[in-house]
Amino acid sequence: AVLAAMIAKADVFIQNLAPGAMARAGFGSVALRAKHPRLITVDISGYGEEGDYATMKAYDLLVQAETGLAWVTGRAEGPGRVGVSCCDIACGMNAHAAVLEALIARFITGQGKGIAVSLFDGMADWMTVPLLQFEGTGRNPPRIGLAHPSICPYGAFGTRDGQLVLISIQNEREWTSFSAHFMDEPGLPQREGFRSNNERVANRAMVDAHIAAMFASLTRDACATKLRRANTAYGFVNDCEGLRTHPALRRIAVGTPQGPVEINAPAARLSDGPRALGPVPALGAHTRAVRAEFAG
């Protein structure tokens, strides 16, 4: 009764139970929209609500595997897992965007609509480029860790002080500058095996080894100085401590029942200043108020 009363006043109803579970409980999206025409319903699933996969369990890593993401991630020795729950996150982002679109449409038409989002569809969309590459060439994109399958040099190199620096050379002008100002070898682009990107890709092991020797002779800070002088795109391969102390990281304090904690700030920056985030409620903190509001 409480849920039905809440839905009657709601703009959006989102559920991610097993396909058909809400309908069996009397809260199927089609029936809800028939009863409440302005309601926007969102059904989140692993693989959609029809077909052989509809009843499959769909944890994030399983979907990484099923969509081919795990296959193109990692090193040559075998597939790898993306280190964050990207399928879950992508699904939520797709649902959020679709809800905003539906709210705008309802403002115009006065009608709600049904939205269905699956973890599989969200990650399959992200896999468009590898899939098109396979369909165009008949070959799966190779797994090469932090390198790039069609660009060289492009990858992470170890420094004298045990750090990793990632570089990306996008064109021959950048390669010429990198050779002169970082490698201190202005004639390197004229050497056999180093002359063009195609040559460098074909001789990747030789090129990478030659570049790695220079990185290994320098500290991370010295590498950064020379890379900036060469105007080469680079980044540090940070661990979590590196992220925690990163100068670009924005953090905010949020209240919890155990006291304030710092978390990473939401990505979007608003022109009228940072948004105010309320405290995280304790489990059941609002149960009595919600029941009182919708009980009768």
Regions from the PLM with identified roles:
Residues 153-230, 234:
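Aromatic-enriched alpha-helical interface/lid elements that frame and gate functional surfaces
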Residues 1-34, 216:
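A structured beta-alpha segment of the ubiquitous adenosine-cofactor-binding alpha/beta core
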Residues 228-252:
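Conserved PLP cofactor-binding pocket of PLP-dependent enzymes
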Residues 23-169:
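Active-site-adjacent "lid/gating" segments in soluble enzymes
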Residues 91-95, 174, 287:
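Catalytic-loop motifs flanking and including active-site residues across diverse enzymes
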Residues 254-296:
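Flexible, small-/acidic-enriched active-site or ligand-binding loops
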Residues 144-149, 155-156, 202, 258-261, ...:
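Short Gly/Pro-enriched turn/cap motifs at secondary-structure boundaries
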